[in-house]
Amino acid sequence: MNPRIHIQKLTLCAIWLLASVWAQAGDLAQKLQSADHVLLMRHTLAPGVGDPDNYTLTDCKTQRNLSAEGRQQATAIGHWLRNQGITQAEVYSSPWCRCKDTAALLKFTDWQVEPSLASFFDDMRQAPASTRALQGFIAEKTKTKGNKALILVTHHVNIFEFAGENIASGDMVLAKVNAQGQMVSYQLIPRPH
């Protein structure tokens, strides 16, 4: 094969690959600007399962918290989201400290605690009611967020109940929702490295 033709083919492949990546980046930002998409994110790395006995939501020292690696992951995800073209976002967090820390480290303008994102790991019987509350919150927020991204930082159990997807720490689910806040379809977005 002529080396010049081979180089041209490689160059065209590289251009196509870059264009594909840029299109995907713009696609995420564009979807999150619409009223029918929301990004659910599992908090970043907090080693262990559940919380210690006798934990309280008002005292982070009693909870399972982000590790140093988890804090770095949250900061990196915030950078990645901005590199995808997401410059404005309404960020909401579960009341658990590992979620609040993840939300803060994303470094969007501000974030707020939202009770419907609270974990029901300690009492799985709460799953249906909690999911209905989350759907109601999503339905309300997608109507009022304008073109800002809606980012919800929560827990594995909440995302599994909402989307039926097992996800790792820092993974995200881009959910298309209907007017009632119910998921129509979703795309798993693994934690960027």
Where are these regions (language model features)?
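Bacterial N-terminal signal peptides that target proteins for export
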Residues: 2-11
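N-terminal signal peptide c-region/cleavage motif recognized by signal peptidases
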Residues: 18-23
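Active-site-proximal alpha-helix that buttresses catalytic centers in soluble enzyme cores
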Residues: 26-115, 120-124, 165-193
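Generic beta-sheet signal
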Residues: 36-38, 146-154
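Short, surface-exposed amphipathic charged segments that create phosphate/polyanion-binding patches used
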Residues: 125-133
